[in-house]
Structure formats: C-alpha cells, structure tokens
C-alpha cells in the first residue's frame, strides 16, 4: 500500500474482507449519521406496517461514509434479499434483466456509483422503478420486438459520490434522498474503539482519539489507520496503542494531525507555489501534480474544502489562508479565509 492510499476514502482490496467483518448487523448499531438513521427507521417501520416495499432510496456523499453499509442494513431490517451491482458493471439493459427478474417482493437492489449508468440503462430502469415492469428485447434487426414483463415490487437503493451527474428524471424517481456527511471526531472515536474490540487491539482512549482525529471524517480511513497503527504497536510498542504510539505510527505514514497526507500537501503547494494561490482550473491543477482530475474532485477536494484548506470558486480552486499557514507560508493580504468544520 502506498502512502497516498493510506488516507484515500476509496475502498481498497485489503479493505473488503475487513469491512465485511466490521459491518453492523442492525441499523441501531450503525454509528453516526443520526438524522439519516432516524429518517430511515421511520421509513422502514412505516413500510413494514403497510406491508409495502420501502420507497426507492438515494444516498450521496463522499466515499467511505457508509452508503453500502446502509443498503445492507435496510435489507437486513426488512428481512429481504440484497442484490448488489454497480453503474460501471452494467453495460447494456440486458445486464439488468437477470437481477430484476430474480427479485422477490420487497427485495433490495443496490446500485453503487449509479451516476455512471449509461443513458440507455437509465431509461430501462424508469419503468422498473415506477411500474414494476420491464421491456425485454427478443431480437435485433428487422425482426426485433420487445415483450413487457412484470416484476415484483422492489426497492432500488442508489449510491453516488456525484449527485450532480445524475439526470433529473432519474433523481425524481427516488422517493427518499439522503446526504451522508463527514463524521465528527466523537463518532469516529466510537468506531475506532469498536473496531479495536473486534480486532482485539489493546488501546487506550487517547490512542483512539489520536487515530480518530486524523481520519478525515471517514470511517473507512479510521479503520485503515487503526490497522496500520496496530502493526506499528505490535512491532515497536508491545502491542498497546497509546497517543504516543499512534502519533509515531501516523508520522511514519506522513499523516499529519489534520489527517492530511503527502498528496494533499502536493495539491495545496502546487496551487500556492505554481499558481500564486489560485484561482486555478481543475484540469490545470491535475496536470501540475500528475493526478487524475476525477480523483482530485471526488477523493481529495471534499475533505480539503470541508476542512477549510481549499475554496471552489467560479474561476477555479483557491488556497485559503489556513492552507498557507499550515504549509508554513505567509498568507497574502486578502487571501481566502475559511474556517474548518472539525
């Protein structure tokens, strides 16, 4: 694992098995996002009372905040099956026929990265979501014909990091839409302690706090940092995680006390040193640091904006006075000032 991957909120191969073992079994066990949890609890209770499927749900927000976990919990709470797929995996309408026709009454179909659905697949979904009916194409060419087929009533749960990329017709078909935000340190501490118990890690409260506050408001990052600090503790600190052990381990990984890593520093330094603090366009900035524009926009920018290091303006990205000071530069007169949220 590279140092840049340590703090990425994107799921890595090594995360998959661990996240499954840490996933809560009931909605009440889900930590954080209290307003979303309360709203979901009401929706689920109402659907059970009416003996109806829950309205189609859409979760949006940065990666690593629990969208997939919530889809799993919705199915568990309702006692129904969960079918999982993703936007990039669906290349043609026929790829959805098998999942949709195999659904039973009330089952949940989860589509991750739903903003990456092709237009033809979106249109195929419309009748499935509204009328619980799909049109199956039986042949191509002059003999082509479609046959309508009814399917069981189901709940579609979509997840996206890019709400603005969803078409208006698709968004309008979701009855429940929730934004997942970055987690406060207090919630992340609870998550770190719970993960430590599951992994049988010896850790004091200060050690858990130190990991939590450097986790970029993201549970996935918190759990990954805990595993790396555990490695350090087992090799160099008799297996016990204290504040001092966590500080030493995270310093070795180039994760500072705000949770910023090497890539964050490169991005902010490029804006300050190469573009006089900005504004600078996304594509230009990406070329300057050798990173994909989509990765910058989806993975790095949300936290930097929320934490007050970066501003998005109509003319481009601007480094804030806080970014200047954090990197040891003197902010220019009139530089953007944006307080952090954590």
From Swiss-Prot:
Its main location: cytoplasm. It comes from the Bacteria. GO terms for molecular function: ATP binding; ATP hydrolysis activity; four-way junction DNA binding; four-way junction helicase activity. It is found in: Cytoplasm. DNA binds at residues 312, 317. Pfam families: AAA_lid_4 (PF17864), RuvB_C (PF05491), RuvB_N (PF05496). Keywords: ATP-binding, Cytoplasm, DNA damage, DNA recombination, DNA repair, DNA-binding, Hydrolase, Nucleotide-binding. InterPro entries: AAA+_ATPase, AAA_lid_4, DNA_helicase_Holl-junc_RuvB, P-loop_NTPase, RuvB-like_N, RuvB_C, WH-like_DNA-bd_sf, WH_DNA-bd_sf. Gene3D superfamilies: 1.10.8.60, P-loop containing nucleotide triphosphate hydrolases, Winged helix-like DNA-binding domain superfamily/Winged helix DNA-binding domain. Mg(2+) binds at residue 68. It catalyses: ATP + H2O = ADP + phosphate + H(+). The keyword Nucleotide-binding applies. Residues 1-183 are annotated as: Large ATPase domain (RuvB-L). Belongs to the RuvB family. The RuvA-RuvB-RuvC complex processes Holliday junction (HJ) DNA during genetic recombination and DNA repair, while the RuvA-RuvB complex plays an important role in the rescue of blocked DNA replication forks via replication fork reversal (RFR). RuvA specifically binds to HJ cruciform DNA, conferring on it an open structure. The RuvB hexamer acts as an ATP-dependent pump, pulling dsDNA into and through the RuvAB complex. RuvB forms 2 homohexamers on either side of HJ DNA bound by 1 or 2 RuvA tetramers; 4 subunits per hexamer contact DNA at a time. PANTHER family: HOLLIDAY JUNCTION BRANCH MIGRATION COMPLEX SUBUNIT RUVB (PTHR42848:SF1), PTHR42848. Homohexamer. Forms an RuvA(8)-RuvB(12)-Holliday junction (HJ) complex. HJ DNA is sandwiched between 2 RuvA tetramers; dsDNA enters through RuvA and exits via RuvB. An RuvB hexamer assembles on each DNA strand where it exits the tetramer. Each RuvB hexamer is contacted by two RuvA subunits (via domain III) on 2 adjacent RuvB subunits; this complex drives branch migration. In the full resolvosome a probable DNA-RuvA(4)-RuvB(12)-RuvC(2) complex forms which resolves the HJ. NCBIfam families: PRK00080.1, ruvB. Has 3 domains, the large (RuvB-L) and small ATPase (RuvB-S) domains and the C-terminal head (RuvB-H) domain. The head domain binds DNA, while the ATPase domains jointly bind ATP, ADP or are empty depending on the state of the subunit in the translocation cycle. During a single DNA translocation step the structure of each domain remains the same, but their relative positions change. This is Holliday junction branch migration complex subunit RuvB.
């Amino acid at each position: 694992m590279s140092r840049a991957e340590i703090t990425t909120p994107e799921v890595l191969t090594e995360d998959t098995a661990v996240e499954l073992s840490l996933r809560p079994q009931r909605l009440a066990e889900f930590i954080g996002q209290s307003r979303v949890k309360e709203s979901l609890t009401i929706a689920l209770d109402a659907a059970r009372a009416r003996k109806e499927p829950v309205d189609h749900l859409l979760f949006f927000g940065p990666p690593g905040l629990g969208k997939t976990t919530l889809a799993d919990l919705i199915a568990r709470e309702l006692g129904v099956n969960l079918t999982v797929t993703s936007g990039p995996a669906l290349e043609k309408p026929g790829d959805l026929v098998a999942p949709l026709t195999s659904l039973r009454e009330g089952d949940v179909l989860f589509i991750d990265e739903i903003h990456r659905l092709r237009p033809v697949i979106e249109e195929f979904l419309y009748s499935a979501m509204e009328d619980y009916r799909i049109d199956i194409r039986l042949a191509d060419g002059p003999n082509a014909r479609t046959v309508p087929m009814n399917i069981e009533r189901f709940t579609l749960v979509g997840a996206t990091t890019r709400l603005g990329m969803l078409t208006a017709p698709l968004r309008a078909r979701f009855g429940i839409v929730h934004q997942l935000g970055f987690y406060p340190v207090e919630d992340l501490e609870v998550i770190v302690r719970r993960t430590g118990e599951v992994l049988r890690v010896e850790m004091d409260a200060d050690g858990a706090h130190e990991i939590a506050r450097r986790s970029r408001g993201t549970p996935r990052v918190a759990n990954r940092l805990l595993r790396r600090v555990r490695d350090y503790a087992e090799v160099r600190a008799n297996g016990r995680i204290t504040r001092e052990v966590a500080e030493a381990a995270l310093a070795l990984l180039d994760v500072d006390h705000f949770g910023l890593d090497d890539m964050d520093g490169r991005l902010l330094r490029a804006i300050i040193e190469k573009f006089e603090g900005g504004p600078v366009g996304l594509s230009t900035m990406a070329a300057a640091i050798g990173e994909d524009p989509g990765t910058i926009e989806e993975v790095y920018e949300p936290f930097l904006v929320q934490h007050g290091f970066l501003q998005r303006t109509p003319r481009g990205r601007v480094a804030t006075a806080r970014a200047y000071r954090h990197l040891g530069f003197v902010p220019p007169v009139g530089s953007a000032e944006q307080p952090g949220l954590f």
